[in-house]
Structures are given as C-alpha cells and as structure tokens.
Amino acid sequence: MITPRFSITQDEEFIFLKIFISNIRFSAVGLEIIIQENMIIFHLSPYYLRLRFPHELIDDERSTAQYDSKDECINVKVAKLNKNEYFEDLDLPTKLLARQGDLAGADALTENTDAKKTQKPLIQEVETDGVSNNIKDDVKTIGQMGEGFNWEIEQKMDSSTNNGILKTKYGFDNLYDTVISVSTSNGNDINELDDPEHTDANDRVIERLRKENLKFDPEYYVSEYMTHKYGNEEDLEINGIKELLKFTPSIVKQYLQWYKDSTNPNLVMPIEFTDEEQKQMQDNLPKKSYLVEDIKPLYVTILSVLFSYVFEQIENEGTHTTESAWTMGKLCPQISFLDQQLKQVNELQDGMKEISKVNKDSSLIKIAIITGIRRALSYPLHRNYDLAMKAWTFVYYILRGGKRLVIRALLDIHETFRFHDVYYVYDKVLLDDLTAWFISQGSENVIRSLALEMRKEQESLSKQDIEFECIASFNEQTGEPEWETLNIREMEILAESEYREQQQNPQ
C-alpha cells in the first residue's frame, strides 16, 4: 500500500482533507472512506491512509467526498462532533499518521511542586542587531511545567558486551549497525571513529575525548582570542569575528520578534508550517512507531544537534553552503562519534557502571554544553568562546519557542544532510528517526524543562570549565609527548602576559 500525500484545513464546523492520488484511474466503486470517532481511514487501491485527529468527528449527511480530476485529488469534508472545537497540529502529518498508542503519554509529565526555585532569570538582557531585548521569564511557571523531569543518568547493569568481534549498535535508540563503515569507504570524513562498527558506547566517549585534545590547537585559539581583544579595525574586518558576534539567525529572530510582540510570552510560540515543510514531513520522514525506553539521550541529542545547527548558521551568516553538513556533523558528538552517552564511565568489579571522576559532578546537559564548546574551539574557522556561548544562548531561545519551533529547526537540519551524496547516512541512522519521533512523541513540557536546565548550566559555566590535554614538551629520551591539562582561561592569561611583555620591551 502507498501512503498518499495530503493536506488538511479546518473551519469552525468541518475538517477539509485533500488526498492526492496521481497516476491512477479513479473508480468510485473501489473508494472506501471510514469515519470512526477521531479517525479517518481512506482506501483506494493502491493508496491507503489512516489519520488520527486530536478530537472526534461525526459521519452524517454533511460529509462529502468529491474527485477533482484537474488536481488529481479527492476532497473530503467531514463534520466535527463539537462545533467551534479547534483541532491542533493539523500541519504535522507524522503525528496524524501515528498508530494507536504512539502518542499516549507523549505530553504527560508529573509536576513537582517542591522543585527548587531558580535564582536567576532564564533570559537576561541581550543585544541583538543593536536592539536591546529585555526578556524576562516567569521562572515559577516554567519550573512547575518542567522541573519534574529528571535529567540524571541512571546507573544500571550493562547488558551489552563487545569482545571486538560482535558489531555494536549506534544511531537513534541504538538501532543501527554497518551503515557508517560503508559510508567511510565513500568519503565520509565526518566520522572520526577508527572502527565505528566495533567500538562500544564507553569507548566512543574515550576516543572522542582523546581526539578532541589532539585536534585542539592552543596557538590557533589564542591567536583568535588576541585578535578579538587587541586587534585593530583592519584585523577584525579580515578575521570577521566582530560581524559574526552581531549576527542572529533567522529562526532566532522569529522567536525574539514573537516574544517582543506577545502579550503572554510564557506560552509556546505559534508556528504555521509552510507547504514545503509539510511536504517534507510527508515525503521524507519515516512513518514508524517508536517504543523508546530511555528518552533522555534523545532530548540531549536534540540539544547538541541544535547547537551545531545554530553555530553553522552564525558561521555562514544564515546561508547553507556545501560545507554546512560537515560543520554540523563535526560539532555534534552524536554524529561525528556516534556518542550519545557523552559521560565516560568506569567498569566496576560487580558489573556496575560508575561515572568517571573526570566528569562525575557534571550533569549530562552540562557535559553536552562543554562538549559543544570544546568542538567549536577545535573545528570551525572561527574558534571563539564568546561565539560558542552566543550559539548556546540562541539554542535556549529555540527551545523556549516550543516544540514546533524545534521541529522547524530539525527539518532544516534534516534537509541539509539529505541533499549530500555522502553525509545523508546520518539522516538514515539518526535524523530521520529523531525528527519523526519528536514530531509524534516530543513533549512541550520536557522541552521547557530542557530549556530551563540548559540555561541554568550555561549560566554557571566559566572558561575554567573548558579544559584540554595539551602537549607541554617531548621526552628527550623517548621522544614521547608529555601532556598537561590547561583550561582556556589559563591559556588566555599566558598569552596576555606575553603580549604585555612584548609591549613593554619592543625589539
């Protein structure tokens, strides 16, 4: 059976469903339309469509179905059971196509009335395009909606084993294998794992941390820092960092404009998806049901994906280029290292997993933020801490915009990878399912909670938290490198000290 394309509109009394049935000879005899409670079932071989609506319909004499030969479509009109009832999310085809049970509990979240009070406003005054946006959130309201979601990592027995022979699973909910190794032979240089098919989750974290340290160039970072702080106008113009720090991506501008005009900014931002976005949801996303045991890694993956997207938009000033997918892939650890665990854990004798002392005191969200910054200081052209923090602030705005604004960003990301001849594999192993799952089962409350926690962790972050293992010297006898741990603030202090010394003692 083929799922046809469709579009839906409504008025106070009716739902109007347009079903496209191109390239077949229409026969009214073979047409079957069933209306049952909140469901419409359409069948005309080889097409089959089953839609579930948020509210109930009624099949009476007012319902009609007419074939339009010019547009090759069938126009179905069905009455609402309750007149003037508004049907939500009619422009989310993936959600309408979901099977019974897929949506159950998607927005359920137990409120925690004893949640801690946040001490800082979630949005502070930020300069955007020269306009001061004084944005203040109702922290108590957001806390009640979101703080009930527990972002702590659960300690449990590790049921998976990897002896170096068995393939490991990766991607969305660890459903995939084999795909990435095939793509590397076709030129997939986003992948950084030496052996993606036989590296387990914890070893991916270890390999990622090691390679981030090797990739980070202290001299490059310090040069960018000194240019930004002490460079003249010509240096800043050549470097471009000054203009990038002023840039705001279009999707963030949409939120800020809505927030400025809104009479109740604590609500989620209303989004009407374009025809192109609706077509993308119908044609390019899988129609699956998902039974995910642990949804926290999926929301943290969305966090990292959004950061990579926003940073790429800033870096390219809002225009996707041939390098956009590469940039986003490199900045996102769940893509470049297939790393959805993020935290390194140690194996104990009883088989339990213990969080490594390196990041034991950090939450998963804080590690996601730090990882994004570390990678933003290692891979792109502009490696600037303020730029990375600005990107995280913009991620917060997208999350505060609500589920539909996040969907808009995910659709843009998905499309960028879909059009690439090699990198499209990351749609297949992650972004296809992640986007479809979030459309059908993503929760406004959890997104609000994620925004709250992300903002809290970001505000508590400092340059001292961004550490790298750097080569200090080489052993004279063995020639092996000797390493030392430095945070980026220490690097800046050393560079400024050397700069002042040069200014005082010019050659």
UniProtKB/Swiss-Prot annotation:
Task: Give the note.
Answer: Present with 7060 molecules/cell in log phase SD medium.
Compartment(s): Nucleus
The answer, when asked if Nucleus is one of the entry's keywords, is yes
UniProt KW Cell membrane keyword: no
What's in the keyword line of the UniProt record?
A: Nucleus
Q: Please give one Gene Ontology molecular function term for this protein.
A: unfolded protein binding
Q: Self-association or partners: how does it assemble?
A: Interacts with CBF5, NAF1 and NHP2. The interaction with NAF1 and SHQ1 does not occur when NAF1 is associated with the chromatin.
Q: Which PROSITE patterns match?
A: CS
Question: Which cellular components does GO assign to this protein?
Answer: cytoplasm; cytosol; nucleoplasm; nucleus
Coiled-coil blocks: none
- A Pfam family found in this protein is SHQ1-like_CS
Q: Where is the CS domain?
A: 1-91
Please state what the protein is called.
Protein SHQ1
Phylogenetic lineage: Eukaryota, Fungi, Dikarya, Ascomycota, Saccharomycotina
Q: Which gene encodes it?
A: SHQ1
What biological process terms from GO does the record include?
Answer: box H/ACA snoRNP assembly
Q: Per its UniProt record, what SUPFAM superfamilies does this chain match?
A: HSP20-like chaperones
What family does this belong to?
Belongs to the SHQ1 family.
**What is this protein for, i.e. what is its function?**
Involved in the early biogenesis steps of box H/ACA snoRNP assembly.
Where primarily located? nucleus
